[in-house]
């Protein structure tokens, strides 16, 4: 009874959790209720496609996690979806989805998604970058940790390269009290390649 008018007018319910995105579709998670409710998780991406973004919470609730990027074979791997924002008054933000892995011989890994904004609570952590191709291909960059009014989100780690290729750069730390941790750079190729750079504060 309470949700129907709000849903029709504003496109989201007054109370209730958002729906999760279906796996393999890259669909975004639904937003939670304006007053109470957590955002739904983003759906994982199909092969080579990005994961969906997590849904945002309202005043009270947790942000949905971003969906993982789809693995790449002939083409590039998909990026992870961004985490949803946490509740404005209370709630943890969603973490960014991990970048897709490269299953081919010369394909770069997908980048990790960024963490969701923290509202008044903990910010979301960045997703891990996907691993590069078995022979050639750089690791994906780690997602950035989001800013928060309390602890900032941690940056995601960069992806590891294969035999030839550079490791992905680590994600930057989110601003907060205290600040989040920076993401570590991914390891470069076993035969040739530089390690990724550590994220910045």
Predicted regions mapped to residue ranges:
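Long, compositionally biased tandem-repeat segments
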Residues: 1-201
């Amino acid at each position: 009874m309470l949700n129907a008018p709000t849903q029709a007018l504003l496109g989201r319910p007054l109370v209730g959790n958002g729906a999760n995105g279906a796996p393999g579709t890259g669909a975004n998670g639904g937003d939670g209720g304006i007053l109470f409710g957590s955002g739904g998780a983003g759906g994982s991406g199909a092969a080579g496609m990005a994961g969906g973004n997590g849904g945002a919470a309202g005043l009270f609730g947790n942000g949905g996690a971003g969906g993982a990027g789809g693995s790449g074979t002939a083409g590039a791997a998909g990026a992870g979806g961004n985490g949803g924002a946490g509740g404005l008054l209370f709630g943890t933000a969603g973490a960014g989805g991990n970048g897709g892995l490269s299953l081919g011989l010369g394909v770069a890994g997908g980048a990790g998604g960024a963490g969701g904004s923290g509202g008044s609570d903990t910010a979301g952590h960045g997703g891990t970058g996907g691993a590069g191709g078995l022979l050639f291909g750089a690791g994906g960059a780690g997602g950035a940790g989001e800013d928060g009014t309390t602890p900032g989100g941690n940056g995601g780690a960069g992806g590891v390269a294969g035999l030839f290729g550079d490791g992905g750069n680590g994600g930057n730390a989110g601003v907060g009290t205290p600040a989040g941790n920076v993401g570590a750079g991914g390891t470069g190729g076993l035969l040739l390649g530089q390690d990724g750079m550590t994220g910045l504060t």
